[in-house]
Amino acid sequence: MSYQLVVSEKPSVGAAYAKVLGATNRQDGYWEGNGYLVSWCVGHLVELAPPNVYDAKYTKWSIADLPILPQKWQYLVSASTKKQFGILQKLMHRPDVNSIVNSCDSGREGELIFRLVYQQAGCKKPFSRLWLSSMEESAIREGFAHLKPSTEYDALYNAALCRERADWMVGINASRLFSCLYGQPLAVGRVMTPVLAMTVVREAAIAAFTPEKFYTVALTLADGGTASSKRFAQKADAELLLSKCRKEGRITVQKMERKEKSESPPQLYDLTALQRDANRLLGFTAQQTLDYAQSLYEKRLITYPRTDSRFLTEDMAASLPGLVTDTGRAFAVEEPIPIHVQQVIDGSKVTDHHALLPTKSMAKADLAALPAGERNVVRLIVARLLCAVGEPHRYAETTLTTICAGEEFSAKGKVVLSEGWKTMERKMLGELIGKQKEPAVLPDVQEQSQCSVAGAELKEGQTSPPKHFTEDLLLHAMETASADSMPEGVERQGIGTPATRAATIEKLVQKGFLERKGTKKTKVLLPTDKGKALITVMPEEIQSPEMTADWETKLLQIERSEMEPETFMTEIKEMISSLVTTTEAAKGANALMKNKIIGVCPNCGKSVVEREKGWFCENRECRFVLWKDNAFFKRLSKRLDAHVADKLLRDGRVRLKDCKSAKGKTYNATVLLSCEADGRSKFSLEFEGGC
């Protein structure tokens, strides 16, 4: 009997495929049955080799050895996943396996993950591609019935290779260059550094902003409505006008203009739009939203989440009304739902995957059994579908231009003619969006008529600085970076992709370049002193959002066979070579780049400073360190963060609530810090309530 080997990206996805295919016999690292072997990759099994594999001299960081630009790229099997790679390699070489299916995630990274394993395993057998946008059983069966030739995705693989190798070259060379120049570890990334630069520039603009006061005169009309004057820089000028208006007591209607307007329904979600709304309305980080969406996808409740499209293809039009009705009922929408399918259909704007949708399975699922976060994300996706196919929100806007005391005053009013899609938005998301401000209604007056003034007052305001970046605003900035400077018609501008933006933000936070501050629902992302210092010494070509966005566009062109991979890689190598030969340490930067002191070493009394992987004693002879990735704190289901490190160094102890035992029980305890005989840190527990 011959077998077809199916290789997925994760065990959970592999299990779902195995169930549909009838491969029900569980083996070590794979499923077997019905002519199929179904296994998985556990993410990236094969990784780019570190520099020292190419040459032992690269073990030591030196500017003299830069740039490091491999001519023949080398790969290694990840140490933590060697067993699973061995299983896949053995399965690929089994004599009874005559073909393979790449069923890793349907995108750039999924293509790369499979192909690297295939090549590292030395496999030569033919393989085809499973390309799905839904994990529903019907979609899986349809996908396996219509497998695609692997050659259709060669260009996608080339783009993935270029992305991976460009990131490696920029990260390795720039990190070593700037670490050597400034005498401390500095992590630099092709995507990460421009995103950090955007936050630093924004905070600099806020710090440099000087608010300016202004004054207006507001007239309350006897028949309803309020008319406002222009802004005055001088309070005395506004007070003089106020006095004149009070004496005059009437306004003359110079012009009344009424226009009927409409607000189109919002587009369906792509991943970035979903992450933005989830942050704005629910306070979720981009990574949390992606994690929830991925889980919902694997539970067959939504379609593929890592999409950059906000439209559907023409062949989906016929089934959409049924999906809208069924998902509406799942959320207790009993009234008829207007369904205008054509406004969400445009196959020309669909790339790898269509817009995010709930599935038919979602309409039948027990949503109450879902974790709260997943339930909220599903609600957002369903609400967006019901709104997107709805009718326009129509209203009449009235603008009044009046004269009082020789000065022009204006007033605006609004009357809703048809709620349209906003009815569904309020029904689905009313608690999240809150009560909307009632629009002002103006009196029905004729031009050149006069109206009495019921009251007049002076109002003081001031100009506002730019807003701090929330994840919502930063995602938007990443998505639209360089859009103004890109040629018209270029499809993708921006930094990163929908699939990678969340990870970029998380990496900046984890490395201590960004920090989240604020309430649970409204947190802003602020650059730390370390982040500001890094950007201060970075040359323009490394921190430029425009250059990074240009690279993303070129990767898309490679994906579409519109650009040769070699051309892109040559450009990256030339930029790196130029960077290495022309960059010098910035004058006066040493003080700026100084490590942050957070306390005193309990072993030798010298200063303890923060670095990328922990808090280290400045005394090179001392072995004291508090590791950020700390095994002791992990056993308590806690993190050793800056606040905890500060408390430990200052008081020698820190009280922790809701620690977890190995059996899952919670307890409170105090962690005590001491030192071993050789100076290494040592932790112990002092219990309060028992375990």
Model-derived features with residue positions:
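Secretory-pathway/luminal and periplasmic proteins that interact with or process carbohydrate-rich
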Residues: 299-305
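C-terminal or mid-to-C-terminal helical accessory/interaction module adjacent to the motor/catalytic core
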Residues: 73, 95, 137-221, 258-262
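Intrinsically disordered, low-complexity regulatory segments
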Residues: 1-164, 168, 438, 454, ...
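Metal- or metallocofactor-binding catalytic centers and their adjacent structured scaffolds
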Residues: 235-269, 275
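Short, polar/flexible loop-turn hinges at active-site or ligand-entry regions and domain interfaces
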Residues: 73-76, 104, 124-128, 149-156, ...
